[in-house]
Regions:
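Helix-turn-helix
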Residues: 3-41, 45
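Solvent-exposed, amphipathic alpha-helical segments
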Residues: 3-10, 57-61, 92, 96, ...
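A ubiquitous short alpha-helical element
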Residues: 41-43, 75-82, 108-115
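Hydrophobic alpha-helical connector segments
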Residues: 45, 56-90, 140-147, 169
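Short, basic, alpha-helical segments at the C-terminal edge of helix-turn-helix-like DNA-binding modules
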Residues: 48-54
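Amphipathic alpha-helical segments used for helix-helix packing
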Residues: 71, 84-107
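A surface-exposed regulatory interaction patch that couples sensing to output
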Residues: 84, 88-91, 123-135
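Hydrophobic/aromatic-rich alpha-helical bundle segments in the mid-to-C-terminal region
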Residues: 107-111, 115, 129-179, 183-185
């Protein structure tokens, strides 16, 4: 699956060829077809892998963090960091999101993955509210939708060279403060 993410990050979804992936993964095309049945199955499984891998590095980012507001911020900032794993994931996610416009099967899978990410983010907002670290008047789901959409947009701008990594992270931190209200003293 890592090879599929690398190929998509390098060549895009439209550039994903089973032969190229087989070479990247050092396996036969027959083995890929055996496991994934077809290109669509491969893309669906790659999306699931991307989501699982993102969960891994977001969990790492909040490990040992006890302040609920900081947990939310670190969850979001972990999606915009200069590591091969995050860069590949972000590029592949953006490619899959763009492809979902034209692919209804992929659209449904991507929508479910997005709902899960948004729900996790909304729960982090609720935790910050329960801890007295966020304005109780804000809707956790609305905040989560806006912040996850912002992460995607900032990530695309950073990856395409329109923003520096530092500026993207600074803007995201500012958005968390704007959404949650001032941090209580």
């Amino acid at each position: 699956m890592e090879a599929a993410v690398r190929v998509i990050a390098r060549s895009g979804v439209r550039g994903l060829r089973v032969e190229e992936l087989a070479a990247e993964a050092e396996v036969s095309t027959a083995l890929l077809y055996y496991h994934f049945k077809d290109r669509a199955g491969l893309i669906q499984r790659t999306l699931a892998f991307i989501s699982d891998r993102a969960t891994g590095y977001t969990d790492e980012a909040v490990s040992g963090t006890e302040d609920a507001r900081t947990v939310l911020l670190q969850l979001l900032l972990s999606e915009i960091q200069d590591t091969d794993r995050v860069r590949e994931n972000s590029i592949a996610w953006g490619e899959l999101r763009a492809s979902a416009i034209f692919d209804t099967e992929l659209r449904a899978t991507l929508a479910e993955s997005t709902r899960s990410w948004t729900q996790d983010t909304a729960e982090a907002v609720s935790d910050a509210q329960a801890a007295g670290l966020a304005d109780l008047r804000v809707s956790p789901l609305d905040v989560a939708d806006r912040l996850t959409a912002l992460v995607e947009g900032l990530s695309e701008r950073w990856l395409s060279g329109s923003l520096t990594l530092e500026r993207a992270r600074e803007l995201l931190a500012g958005a968390v403060d704007a959404e949650l209200g001032p941090r209580p003293e």
